[in-house]
């Protein structure tokens, strides 16, 4: 059923076609409408014509680099939130990006789940949130507090590592939806992670032992030949 609520629109800009396609898939899977551009000039045209809710922008691009794009947008009084992506991690580079008008600066390589969280944070500041960004998500006795990065079962905190929580957060935001191993690898471990690894299965096992301890109800389900889903039995 059409609820009449549109998803936030994100413009993704990167001159690497593989990276661009991966980021587009990941953001779409996370509940955003996504448009793309392969260089700074195209990004500037797109941003001016379509007015996205947020922009994810690589720094190093041909024609017009990312800092120049941000500077041009701000000169036109366009205050769209911008998250800059860069392999440059020095303080001077970060300061240059932020002083040009960027709202956030994310150093490559990064985990896709972190980018999604940063985009959602930028959108919250403008009052636009993705449909999947509930503050606390409940599945049976499990409560997942995404902003606070806390998980509770029957009101008791569950001690999770950073990666375990990242995986749980993605599953919670897509509860009742079966996600493939490839989708989880992309969302949690990043687009450059080896696709033939069994790391997803290993971390699903870790989560099961912690979330379903003491004969608790089954929450994490394996759908044979497809992937994994978070839901009550």
From Swiss-Prot:
GO terms for biological process: regulation of DNA-templated transcription. GO terms for molecular function: phosphorelay response regulator activity; transcription cis-regulatory region binding. Phosphorylated by PrrB at Asp-58. It is found in: Cytoplasm. InterPro entries: CheY-like_superfamily, OmpR/PhoB-type_DNA-bd, Sig_transdc_resp-reg_receiver, WalR-like, WH-like_DNA-bd_sf. GO terms for cellular component: cytosol; protein-DNA complex. PROSITE patterns: OMPR_PHOB, RESPONSE_REGULATORY. Member of the two-component regulatory system PrrB/PrrA that is involved specifically in early intracellular multiplication of Mycobacterium and is essential for its viability. Upon phosphorylation by PrrB, functions as a transcription regulator by direct binding to promoter regions of target genes to positively regulate their expression. Autoregulates its own expression. This is Transcriptional regulatory protein PrrA. It comes from Mycobacterium leprae (strain TN). The lineage of its organism: Bacteria, Bacillati, Actinomycetota, Actinomycetes, Mycobacteriales.
């Amino acid at each position: 059923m059409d609820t009449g609520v549109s998803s936030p629109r994100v413009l993704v800009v990167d001159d690497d076609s593989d990276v661009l396609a991966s980021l587009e898939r990941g953001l779409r899977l996370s509940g955003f409408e996504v448009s793309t551009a392969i260089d700074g000039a195209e990004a500037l045209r797109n941003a001016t014509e379509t007015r996205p809710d947020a922009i994810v922008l690589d720094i190093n691009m041909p024609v017009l680099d990312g800092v120049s794009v941000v500077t041009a947008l701000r000169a036109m009084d366009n205050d769209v939130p911008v998250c800059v992506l860069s392999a440059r991690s020095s303080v001077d580079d970060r300061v240059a990006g932020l002083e040009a008008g960027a709202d956030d600066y994310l150093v490559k390589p990064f985990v896709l789940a972190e980018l999604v969280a940063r985009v959602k944070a930028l959108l919250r500041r403008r009052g636009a949130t993705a449909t999947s960004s509930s503050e606390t998500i409940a599945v049976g006795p499990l409560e997942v507090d995404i902003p606070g990065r806390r998980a509770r079962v029957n009101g008791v905190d569950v001690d999770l590592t950073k990666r375990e929580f990242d995986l749980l957060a993605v599953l919670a935001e897509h509860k009742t939806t079966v996600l493939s191993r490839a989708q989880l690898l992309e969302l949690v471990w990043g687009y450059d992670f080896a696709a033939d690894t069994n790391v997803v299965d290993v971390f699903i096992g870790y989560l099961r032992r912690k979330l379903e301890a003491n004969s608790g109800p089954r929450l994490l389900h394996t759908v044979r030949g497809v992937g994994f889903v978070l839901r009550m039995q």
